[in-house]
Amino acid sequence: MGIFMIKRLKKRDVKVPLTVPEDRKEEYIKNYLELTKRTGNVMLFAGDQKIEHLNDDFFGEGIAKDDASPEHLFNIASKGKICGFATQLGLIARYGMDYKKIPYIVKINSKTHLVKTRDPISRALVHVKDVVDLKENSGLKILGVGYTIYPGSEYEHIMFEEASRVILEAHKHGLIAIIWSYPRGKNVKDEKDPHLIAGAAGVAACLGADFVKVNYPKCDNPAERFKEAVLAAGRTGVLCAGGKSIEPEKFLKQIWEQINISGARGNATGRNIHQKPLDAAIRMCNAIYAITIEGKSLEEALKIYYGDRK
């Protein structure tokens, strides 16, 4: 699988949303170019699961012992090649003083999986103003915010309104806004259906998101079918969720196809990175980054991950 050429963006190439005030346009452009490494693509390290999945993803069979401590996430983010590390504000406040060079995306809302409801709802834990205050008071490299919506839930209207306000407030301060968009609820028959995923991507575009994180479809020929979501999102860049840990070769091949066949603008990976020991987690970051940001081939990415180990 050959190399996909990635264009280097200049300031003038960034389409600044009209919701960004004139005096914040430079800040928005700076954050956008930093987050995308001047490519328009994003390799996001997702570390918000300590609320979402409690300790299930961090302790147990097949999970590295390193992962039992939250600091494992920060060690990976500080040593691996990433565009941004997404996690909750509270965790950043507890560890950020020792990891000031990490580019952060603050996850605004989260919920646990303990409440067994067919129609999920996830509300804001903090306000965008709290994020801005942390950025200004700490000097941390906070580039944007993230928010999860569940289209199809009977509570979607609550999340849509809150997400819309989060995006507007983020843009007012020159921050990037990323939406996690997962169709869920008693009326959703198959959340991995490619047509439904495309709809979820389009919802994020209508809310004004800069990027949207969605699940990769489970179907025949997913790389081709996923093109519908990329088209539906328009100028909102589509990022693929990493999902459960799978074999590195299979995962990196999927990443390559998402970028080079489907036209996705990146990925947001959690378990396939942090469930590994630190050295392997760093190598996985570097391999994903090589495909997403550097335009490397699958073979080159596999060599970065395995080195002489295979």
From Swiss-Prot:
Pfam families: DeoC. The active site is at 182 (proton donor), 213 (schiff-base intermediate with dihydroxyacetone-p), 213 (schiff-base intermediate with substrate). Substrate binds at residues 48-49, 53, 57, 180, 184, 213-215, 241-243, 270-271. Keywords: Lyase, Schiff base, Transferase. It catalyses: beta-D-fructose 1,6-bisphosphate = D-glyceraldehyde 3-phosphate + dihydroxyacetone phosphate; beta-D-fructose 1,6-bisphosphate + methylglyoxal = 1-deoxy-D-threo-hexo-2,5-diulose 6-phosphate + D-glyceraldehyde 3-phosphate; beta-D-fructose 1-phosphate + methylglyoxal = 1-deoxy-D-threo-hexo-2,5-diulose 6-phosphate + D-glyceraldehyde. InterPro entries: Aldolase_TIM, DeoC/FbaB/LacD_aldolase, DeoC/FbaB_aldolase, FbaB-like. It comes from the Archaea. Pathway: Aromatic compound metabolism. Its EC number is 2.2.1.11, 4.1.2.13. CDD domains: DhnA. Catalyzes the transaldolization of either fructose-1-P or fructose-1,6-bisphosphate with methylglyoxal to produce 6-deoxy-5-ketofructose-1-phosphate (DKFP). Also catalyzes the reversible aldol condensation of dihydroxyacetone phosphate (DHAP or glycerone-phosphate) with glyceraldehyde 3-phosphate (G3P or GAP) to produce fructose 1,6-bisphosphate (FBP). PANTHER family: FRUCTOSE-BISPHOSPHATE ALDOLASE CLASS 1. This is Fructose-bisphosphate aldolase/6-deoxy-5-ketofructose 1-phosphate synthase. It comes from Methanocaldococcus jannaschii (strain ATCC 43067 / DSM 2661 / JAL-1 / JCM 10045 / NBRC 100440) (Methanococcus jannaschii).
